[in-house]
Amino acid sequence: MFWGSTFVSSKILLDSFTPIELLFIRFLIGFLTLCILSPKILKLENRKDEIWYILSGLTGVFLYYFIESTALVYTYATNVGVIISIAPFFTSILAYLCFKDEPFKMNFVVGFIVAFIGIFFISFNGQQMHLSPKGDILTIVAAIMWAIYSVVLKKVNELGHTSIQNTK
């Protein structure tokens, strides 16, 4: 419920803030909250670990949210909600390509199609769909960024730190 409402609330806030300002406020609140929950500073062992954290921060924290917020400037929140729901599909494809141990089965494709159709009908509820190519394409790029982030996050999680430490 909260996840789905972010598109609408972000769209409203973008009337008063730029995408960068909105992200700054959002991440500042998140960072301060995480500092309270986990005040200990994470010490990384080597440069390779730092690269994984930089990639996760760049793809999943900055680029995904920046592109998504920018897309909301050009298209409807409903479009973003529906289009971004394809991120798990991109994630599965990328995980299969990067980690051959991740199975890619036909039941996933069928389940994805059924879920996407359900999300589409719930989101549009009989209303006409309004396409906005610039915003809709940016949303697809955001979904791809989330897929890259998800694959990078698998590597970050293998470093053995807690989720709060990884997020902070």
Regions found by a protein language model. Give the residues of each.
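Small-residue-rich packing faces within the transmembrane alpha-helices of Major Facilitator Superfamily
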Residues: 4, 24, 28-32, 116, ...
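Juxtamembrane helix-entry segments on the extracytoplasmic side of multipass membrane proteins
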Residues: 16-20, 24, 45-51, 124-145
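Juxtamembrane C-cap of transmembrane helices in multi-pass membrane transport proteins
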Residues: 2-17, 29, 65-75, 83, ...
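Transmembrane alpha-helical segments that form core, pore/gating elements
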Residues: 31-34, 91-93, 129-168
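Hydrophobic transmembrane alpha-helices of multi-pass small-molecule transport proteins
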Residues: 34, 54, 86, 93-94, ...
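Residue-level hotspots within the lipid-embedded alpha helices of multi-pass solute transporters
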Residues: 57-61, 85, 139-147
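Cytoplasmic-side transmembrane-helix entry/capping segments in multi-pass membrane proteins
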Residues: 48-58, 103-116, 135-139, 161-168
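Specific transmembrane alpha-helical segments of multi-pass solute transporters/efflux pumps
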Residues: 1-2, 6-7, 35-84, 121
